[in-house]
Amino acid sequence: MAAFMLGSLLRTFKQMVPSSASGQVRSHYVDWRMWRDVKRRKMAYEYADERLRINSLRKNTILPKILQDVADEEIAALPRDSCPVRIRNRCVMTSRPRGVKRRWRLSRIVFRHLADHGQLSGIQRATW
């Protein structure tokens, strides 16, 4: 009896709480590669100012060589993932690393599929 009451209570509660319009949840990343890239982007953003200042000291030829060497050691002490070179553009739907259209952040395969089915506004196939 208690299980029946609990089930009916949950059903009524579920009907009262509005769900999202599409029913899709987009709070997770596609795979671990995308999550790793997101962490790298965050770290590169955090260390961007510090890295810029240290690199300007390293590349300044007017400063003494000893100071440039100290700046080299400081840049080497920073985390590897703080370097923006390690960031890779990935498709937001499939996490594919190659053939990504930068403007839409989609791989060429997903982009073509969505464009063919009219799901990208303003995009249509060329006809001549």
From Swiss-Prot:
GO biological process: mitochondrial translation; translation
Primary site of residence: mitochondrion
Cell compartments where the protein resides: Mitochondrion
Keywords, alphabetical: Disease variant, Mitochondrion, Primary mitochondrial disease, Ribonucleoprotein, Ribosomal protein
Disease: Combined oxidative phosphorylation deficiency 38: An autosomal recessive disorder due to mitochondrial dysfunction and characterized by perinatal hypertrophic cardiomyopathy, growth retardation, muscle hypotonia, elevated lactate, dysmorphy and intellectual disability.
Listed GO CC annotations: mitochondrial inner membrane; mitochondrial ribosome; mitochondrial small ribosomal subunit; mitochondrion; nuclear membrane
Pfam families reported for this sequence: Ribosomal_S14
Entry's Gene Ontology molecular function annotations: RNA binding; structural constituent of ribosome
Name of the protein this chain belongs to: Small ribosomal subunit protein uS14m
Family, similarity comment: Belongs to the universal ribosomal protein uS14 family.
Record carries keyword Manganese: no
Coiled coil feature spans: none
Keyword Cell division part of the UniProt annotation: no
PANTHER family from the UniProt entry: 30S RIBOSOMAL PROTEIN S14, SMALL RIBOSOMAL SUBUNIT PROTEIN US14M
Subunit structure, as described in the record: Component of the mitochondrial small ribosomal subunit (mt-SSU). Mature mammalian 55S mitochondrial ribosomes consist of a small (28S) and a large (39S) subunit. The 28S small subunit contains a 12S ribosomal RNA (12S mt-rRNA) and 30 different proteins. The 39S large subunit contains a 16S rRNA (16S mt-rRNA), a copy of mitochondrial valine transfer RNA (mt-tRNA(Val)), which plays an integral structural role, and 52 different proteins. Interacts with LIAT1.
